[in-house]
Amino acid sequence: MNLYTSFVTKRVSRLLGVAIAWSAIAPLALSQAAFSQVVFSQVEQTVQFLPTPPDQGSPDGRQRGGATRGDCLEYQELTAIVPKVDGVVWSQTTSALPTFFFQVPAELTEEVPLEFVIQDSNDAYVVRQQFSVDAEAGLLAVPTTAELGELTVGESYSWTFSIYCDETRPSASVSVTGTVQRVGDEVVGSVADSSEILPAEQFRLLQQYASEGIWHEAIGIAIALHQADPNNVTYQETLQSLFTQAGIVPATDEVQ
């Protein structure tokens, strides 16, 4: 039993203002069907996401897993919940240890190894997490840990999330890749210092993050609000709007 399956870390995010029990690697309460329903509803954009252009020379990355074969076929539509900006899978965060979100198109089990890595400009590992998790198809949250280091303000990093899905070929995997940059947290002002943030204030903070192009905090708040009140139409529309503006197309329930 490894680190990620041997304990559950519970933390209350002051920023999100919603008490959420996070496992180290947390399947979220958005199943494949629910995720697709949210994303494909026809709504107006309630939050404006204005991303900063990616660093010149940033690799394009890969938002969708792509074609594969064998046991990996069911995971080929693995999708990173990260924007594609000017053709580059690119995001910004204010956190030294941001959470990443992925749509996993098929069930995960303890027998399916996963790996998430973040590397600096010299290819040194800042984050390297190898784990497994029992989770249905749907949205998966991957919080990062500080075992090797943290993201530095002003620096850009490459990341890769991989599912090693073919036991007959241990090196075979389906992967998504991109670039993340840490920026200063001036956008949040004094709000982030409050230990109790009402939903209306959270939504305003979400709007601030989105307008500054700070993806990880914006999408994290949007998902948390939707989880806390799944029948709230505004939260549904906001989540859909962010996916649409970021160029994220969810995988279908059926592998093509």
Locations of regions flagged by a protein language model:
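Bacterial N-terminal signal peptides that target proteins for export
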Residues: 3-23
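Extended, polar beta-sheet/loop recognition surfaces of beta-rich domains
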Residues: 46-57, 132-135, 153, 165-204, ...
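Contiguous beta-strand segments within globular domains
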Residues: 87-104
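Solvent-exposed loop/turn segments flanking beta-strands in beta-repeat/beta-sandwich domains
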Residues: 105-116, 120-124
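Solvent-exposed serine/threonine-rich low-complexity stretches and specific carbohydrate-binding patches
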Residues: 124-138
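Signal that preferentially marks extracellular ectodomain short beta-strand elements
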Residues: 139-153
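Internal, hydrophobic beta-strand segments that form the core of beta-sheet-rich folds
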Residues: 153-166, 223
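Alpha-helical protein-protein interaction scaffolds
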Residues: 195-256
